[in-house]
Amino acid sequence: MGKRILVQRRGRGGSQFRSPSWKRDGPVRYPPNISGRGIVVEILHEPGLNAPVAKIRMENGVEFFNYAAEGLYVGQVIQVGPDAPPAVGNVLPLGKIPEGTMVFNVEKRFGDGGKFARSGGTYALVIGQRPEENKTIVRLPSGRVIEVDARGRATIGIVAGGGRVEKPFVKAGKKYHRARAKSWKYPTVRGKAMSPYAHPHGGGSHQKGGTPVPKTAPPGQKVGFIGSRCTGRGCVRARAQQKQ
């Protein structure tokens, strides 16, 4: 008799697979209908997030969390709203931001709190305005160019914490604590190293690569490389030749 494989257990959504949001001080998002001046009260480390978080208190007493911009400091005064100057740390509507400005925590839809360019060291670039359509053209960190609502908000600057991926984990224990903060399953066992009852790639007198599952397979059946461009030993070599 077979057993539920890891993909199926994760899809069920048990507590060990849920991100521990209760360990954080609050969601990192813009509050609705807010403008004015505020002050950076504290810069926090939030478990599971890969960038520092700034706690901002507005003049009316409203507090919210936003990713800290590179160079932001405790006690700095920031401004929020359409009348704010495009200075580092200020939050403005995209339609009021000059072309060529680096921004982060960009709203996909007006009022959603911020969806794009939220990782440490990343930024999006405002490359154009279409006031007649109330749209702003933004280049994302991936290089993709999109149009978003010009009323959507963004923060001026670059997310702090750049260079994080350049520092190696060195020890498996560090990787364990990182995975635990984000509820990743760690360490992960290769499917082809399992028994046949535990994984579709398991079993056999010797290990061999599994057959990729089709993209049309239902959830719970998708294992291994999903939609891979190439597999096998020559895969890395083929990608290197394509780049050249």
UniProtKB/Swiss-Prot annotation:
Basic residues: compositionally biased ranges: 1-12
SMART domains, A to Z: Ribosomal_L2, Ribosomal_L2_C
Keywords attached to this entry: Ribonucleoprotein, Ribosomal protein, RNA-binding, rRNA-binding
InterPro entries in the cross-refs: NA-bd_OB-fold, Rib_uL2_dom2, Ribosomal_uL2, Ribosomal_uL2_arc_euk, Ribosomal_uL2_C, Ribosomal_uL2_dom3, Ribosomal_uL2_RNA-bd_dom, Translation_prot_SH3-like_sf
GO cellular component: cytosolic large ribosomal subunit
Pfam families tied to this protein: Ribosomal_L2 (PF00181), Ribosomal_L2_C (PF03947)
One of the GO biological process terms: cytoplasmic translation
Gene3D superfamilies: 2.30.30.30, Nucleic acid-binding proteins, Ribosomal protein L2, domain 3
SUPFAM superfamilies: Nucleic acid-binding proteins, Translation proteins SH3-like domain
Subunit structure: Part of the 50S ribosomal subunit. Forms a bridge to the 30S subunit in the 70S ribosome.
Family annotation (NCBIfam families): PRK09612.1
Protein name (database record): Large ribosomal subunit protein uL2
Highest classification ranks of the organism: Archaea, Thermoproteota, Thermoprotei, Thermoproteales, Thermoproteaceae
